[in-house]
């Protein structure tokens, strides 16, 4: 009898284990759940900003690597591979940071595609008035604005790139070729023109300028239209080794007119003014004071203690203070900043002596490890 019962018991246990392992997690929600509630949609909308404030985005590699594009800013390098990397040389020893920007921007694109499709298929969207602003329509516009923002960075830095307007599905569908940049920019501009009237102004939103708003949508239309109508370096696909040539489409004037119209809307609708001094703008920025109706139209919503090295690399040089073990002290009054990114001395000297912006833009001091300030040995900051 014992030999009979043991296999039966084992079979029951295995069957139970299989049933147990196949259960659905109650903490996992599908689109049918998320996009039937405005509060859940808000969570998905917040997720669209994650790549922006990660080390791959505007507080990290995107700012640190892609802003070095003029004769104003520079940083020191010690090896030839660093120089090659800054020139996008394929033989560079480490170009992972550029790859992270690429993946970060497409992560943002896919998140926005998820939200756009989810809202469009939602019963809330079907019942919504699509002719005037509402919370749902604002979320919808916000998703399209952020998608355009991610694509603009891809086009600005890489030109013709893979283009998707739907969420990533079957992995076989991910391997697509590049789309002409003008097609991408045209689509994005048309998307924004469509949603601009149904978005809230920053002063009407509980997130102010730290989220996409109607006036930011207007400004982004103008900016993208200038790119769409401007000159860009086009590749010679018949000869990949060639440098290419500068070109622009015959309809360029149409997009300059769009840029003028929507930049004019930002100005004429009067939602923002320039009441603060140049100094006060930066004092408030460093004090986490974010007015909804002044100089800033959109602030990347980075948080205190979040990831990213923008302030660390581009900020004032703060000498590290060490603890008894030789490590950076956690209780240093000003923290620590490498100040590795600098402005050229010639740029500082281009300011008029009476221009009050000079000494705020080009800092001539650093914080010593005592917490006191001192004149920097090299007059570049």
Positions of predicted regions on the chain:
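An aromatic- and glycine-enriched ligand-binding surface/loop that stacks and positions planar moieties
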Residues: 18-82, 159-161, 193, 211-380
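Proline-rich low-complexity regions
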Residues: 25-26, 162-165, 199, 203
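Secondary-structure transition into beta-strands, especially the periplasmic turns and strand N-termini
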Residues: 4-8, 14, 127-137, 152, ...
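Residue-level detector of conserved, well-ordered beta-strand and adjacent loop positions
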Residues: 89, 164, 299
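Short edge-strand/loop segments of extracellular domains
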Residues: 167-171
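Conserved, well-structured interaction surfaces
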Residues: 30, 42-56, 78-158, 172-186, ...
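Bacterial Sec-dependent N-terminal signal peptides
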Residues: 1-26
């Amino acid at each position: 009898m014992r030999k009979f019962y043991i296999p039966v018991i084992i079979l029951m246990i295995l069957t139970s284990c299989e049933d147990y392992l196949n259960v659905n997690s109650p903490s996992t929600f599908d689109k049918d759940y998320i996009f039937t509630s405005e509060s859940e949609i808000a969570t998905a909308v917040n997720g669209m900003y994650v790549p922006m404030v990660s080390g791959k985005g505007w507080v990290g590699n995107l700012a640190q690597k892609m802003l070095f594009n003029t004769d104003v800013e520079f940083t020191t390098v010690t090896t030839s591979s660093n120089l090659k990397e800054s020139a996008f040389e394929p033989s560079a020893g480490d170009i992972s940071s550029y790859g992270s920007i690429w993946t970060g921007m497409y992560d943002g694109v896919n998140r926005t595609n998820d939200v756009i499709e989810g809202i469009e298929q939602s019963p809330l969207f079907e019942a919504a008035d699509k002719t005037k602003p509402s919370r749902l329509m604002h979320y919808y516009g916000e998703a399209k604005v952020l998608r355009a923002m991610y694509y603009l960075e891809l086009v600005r830095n890489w030109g013709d790139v893979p283009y998707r307007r739907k969420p990533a599905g079957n992995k076989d569908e991910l391997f697509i070729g590049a789309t002409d940049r003008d097609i991408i920019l045209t689509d994005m501009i048309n998307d924004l023109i469509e949603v601009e009237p149904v978005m809230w102004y920053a002063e009407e939103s509980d997130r102010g300028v730290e989220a996409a708003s109607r006036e930011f949508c207007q400004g982004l239309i103008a900016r993208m239209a200038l790119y769409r109508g401007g000159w860009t370096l086009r590749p010679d696909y018949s000869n990949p080794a060639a440098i290419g040539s500068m070109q622009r489409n015959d309809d360029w004037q149409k997009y300059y007119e769009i840029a003028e119209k929507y930049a004019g809307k930002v100005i004429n609708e009067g939602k923002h003014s320039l009441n603060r001094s140049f100094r006060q703008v930066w004092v408030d920025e460093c004090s986490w004071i974010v007015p909804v109706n002044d100089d800033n139209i959109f602030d990347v919503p980075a948080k205190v203690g979040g990831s990213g090295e923008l302030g660390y690399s581009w900020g004032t040089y703060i000498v590290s203070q060490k603890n008894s073990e030789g490590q950076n002290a956690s209780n240093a009054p000003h923290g620590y900043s490498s100040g590795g990114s600098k402005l050229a001395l010639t740029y500082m000297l281009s300011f008029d002596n009476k221009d009050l912006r000079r000494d705020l833009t080009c800092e001539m001091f650093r914080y010593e490890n005592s917490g006191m300030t001192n004149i920097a040995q090299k007059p570049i900051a």
